[in-house]
Amino acid sequence: MYRQEATTVTILAQAPPNWPAPAFDISGFTSAFRPSRRAQRSNTTMGSIDTNSTDAWHTFAIPRLGIPAMRITDGPNGARGTRYFNGVPSACLPCGTALGATFDTDLLFKLGRLLAAECKAKGAHVLLGPTINIQRGPLGGRGFESFSEDPVLSGNSAASYCAGVKDLGIVPTLKHLVCNDQEHERIAVSAMVTERALREIYLMPFQLAIKNARPGALMTSYNKVNGLHASEDPGLLNHIIRKEWGFEGLIMSDWFGTYSVASAVNAGLDLEMPGPTRFRGPALMHALTSNKVSEKTLDDRVRKVLELVQLTSRAGIPEYAPAQKLDRVEDRVLLRQAAADSIVLLKNANEVLPLDPRKKTLVIGPNADIAAYCGGGSASLLAYYTVTPRQGIAEKCEEVVFSQGCYGHKELPLLGDHLKTETGERGYTFRVYTEPATYEDRQPVDVLHMTNSCAFLMDYSHPKISGDTYYATLEGRFEPTESGVYELGLTVAGTGLLYIDGELVIDNKTKQRHGTSFFGIGTVEERGERYLEAGRQHHVFVEYSTAPTSNLKHHGVVSFGPGGVRLGGCRKLDAETAIKQAVQLAAETEQVVVCVGMNGNWESEGFDRPHMDLPPGTDNLVRAVIEAQPNAVIVVQSGTPVTMPWADQAKALVQAWYGGSEGGNGIADVLFGDVNPSAKLPLTFPRDIAHNPSYLSYRSERGRVLYSEDVYVGYRYYDKVKQAPLFHFGHGLSYTTFKLSGLNVQETDPQASDISAEVVQIYVRPPTTASVGRPVRELKGYEKTMLHPGETKEISVTVPMGVATSFWDEGRSAWLSEKGTYAIEVVGTGERNMLSAPLCVQVSRYWNGL
């Protein structure tokens, strides 16, 4: 029974910390970057142009003034360094939704420190993360990057992440401001959203992160918001972010997300990315001389760039430092913990889990023998290593049997790692030319040995290549382990031909089709088949030409340089036979794990999913296995919700996300009880896409998308209309039973590990007398605590009064904490594990700011 006097939930207002003063005075520098009148007359351009970027990842260095270059790197789940193409590997964290599922601010802080250490190893001063957009629907291509559909969970997670990054002197970047919640026509679409929804849902994560962590940088989104591109919206950048919230950091554009000269500068956009500049060279000089931009405004923009360079100099990272590997043992341990702590136990009827490592275990499914460790796009990462679910389970079990069941790939698995060069090295030879294949006696200007057969050329450069038009070949030898018909795939942003043993197998040059590859500028994967013999080395050769040689035209997408080429392939699988084999083994095996889901080809920047379904054939496999072995454990890997038409029949069901480098070990740790599952869903999982509140207004139509659900995003909608989803926000089971009393949390029924974690969620219900329609309840705070068997702990969760009670009053353009009796609900693991108490607000109060 809840006793009001025993509660330790504290509701209070908190003042933001002060922004640290600069280490040295920069006021005298700004004039050096402003074109002087004499310089204008002599047609020289000084400084304001110099404070922009030189390439995709660096700002200008100005040695005469002692101003160093600053290196910027992607991304939210790992520090890539300066190269997509043939880059240096890095540690890969679980995806954003996985981290949101942990509800663990301490873990996010530690992971932020890991990211900062990786940045230092890569010579980077600024990290482009975290991503804190809102998943208003399940189909967003970048939904996996963000933490949650809930703004408080998202903002608090971001604050802890940023604090960890800052702890080692690296500058985190909040992105993407704002409403970058879909990929369809992302540079052209206008998000039409009410001011109330903008404030309460979409800006709130940024507001909380800025208040609690003071990150040094912020990135604008590609899209428009109510008709104005975010990068040139003065109401958003100057009024809300700078004046109302007091943000002192730098505001940069997303890559090629600057669309104007004067409008962007006047709105408050400090840095155009990437370089060389399109809008801040002679065009900015012209805007200055024509009084479209004032000298003071330009000084303000320059000052912010200098302040950030100054701030990053404290980290002691040399200019243009070579990228290095880190890969420390302690980082592997932390990544494994993060992977396990992010896994949500959705169902566990009859206590099927945890599994017994002494028993023979059958592992089935398309995701069992691959590492679906990250989503696609700018969040993709070349990891130091990856662990598949099958590998993780094999480390636990005495006997493991594998059956494929079906394939789950959208594009064929990369072939590069299975090729060999002429000298027998693993991989293939990549040769670059300035002349096309028709040119006689052409010689390569560059020869590289590579293993990754997805070559995205955005940041490839060579002294002998000018412009984006050039040519390349990929050459290697493939020796199959089994004879049979193999399917090959060639995807290009450009044009390409694939030859096997001298014969043309794929023509992706003369007749091309639009696809979603390479951020939406590439083709579909064109496929061809060929019978290949085991033990024989087959010659594989790709003739590739860069993007300008293609006649395909694209609308509403970002063009990242010269394009790319992707080569995939695998043995063709008879779907019916593969399922039958898996089912037969399942019927004969007591302990069965089915690993299904998506990967970075299905969920990626550059496009949205057309539906919520799992890859073709997956549902048939799962149904058949459950029928043969009802105790089969179903493990789903996806960054956002998927349909599970067999969920009611499954006894044990686990949501495992994209778990980063240690994803396979994390899955095994939870399945076998070495880690007690404690994660909670950061997203609502609907039964069907039609049940989602954004269903009728998600994609761009005639250049706009209407946020018709208003503030009723995610669980706020399902609560309001009293519709039960498949799995609700905040759901997550444990192998242990917990009990709340007051805010004393007790572990009463330990079944697995000696230590268990419980997440306590704090929701607030508005007064019945509220003057506007409000969500039934909203998450306002949470706490994760560790417990030994039988232990009782008292938890204190502090929630600012404004965050707890306020809504945005559009009539007053202010927050309103309205008088009335609110209800605080404290929710633990289990449907009935809940406490409640009233909270009385005696006087209505308007407020602005943080």
UniProtKB/Swiss-Prot annotation:
Keyword set, alphabetical order: Carbohydrate metabolism, Cellulose degradation, Glycoprotein, Glycosidase, Hydrolase, Polysaccharide degradation, Secreted
Primary localization class, coarse: secreted
Active site (record annotation): D254
Residue positions the entry lists as glycosylated: N43, N52, N508
GO molecular function: beta-glucosidase activity
Gene Ontology BP term (one): cellulose catabolic process
Location(s), subcellular: Secreted
EC class: hydrolase
Gene Ontology annotations for the cellular component aspect, listed alphabetically: extracellular region
InterPro entries noted in UniProt: Cellulose_deg_GH3 (IPR050288), Fn3-like (IPR026891), Glyco_hydro_3_AS (IPR019800), Glyco_hydro_3_C (IPR002772), Glyco_hydro_3_C_sf (IPR036881), Glyco_hydro_3_N (IPR001764), Glyco_hydro_3_N_sf (IPR036962), Glycoside_hydrolase_SF (IPR017853)
Catalytic activities: Hydrolysis of terminal, non-reducing beta-D-glucosyl residues with release of beta-D-glucose
Keyword Metal-binding included in the entry's annotation: no
Annotated pathway: Glycan metabolism; cellulose degradation
PA14 domain ranges (all copies): 423-583
Enzyme Commission number(s) of this protein: 3.2.1.21
Family: Belongs to the glycosyl hydrolase 3 family.
Free-text function comment from the UniProt entry: Beta-glucosidases are one of a number of cellulolytic enzymes involved in the degradation of cellulosic biomass. Catalyzes the last step releasing glucose from the inhibitory cellobiose.
The protein, known as: Probable beta-glucosidase J
Organism in which the protein naturally occurs: Emericella nidulans (strain FGSC A4 / ATCC 38163 / CBS 112.46 / NRRL 194 / M139) (Aspergillus nidulans)
Organism classification: Eukaryota, Fungi, Dikarya, Ascomycota, Pezizomycotina
Gene: bglJ
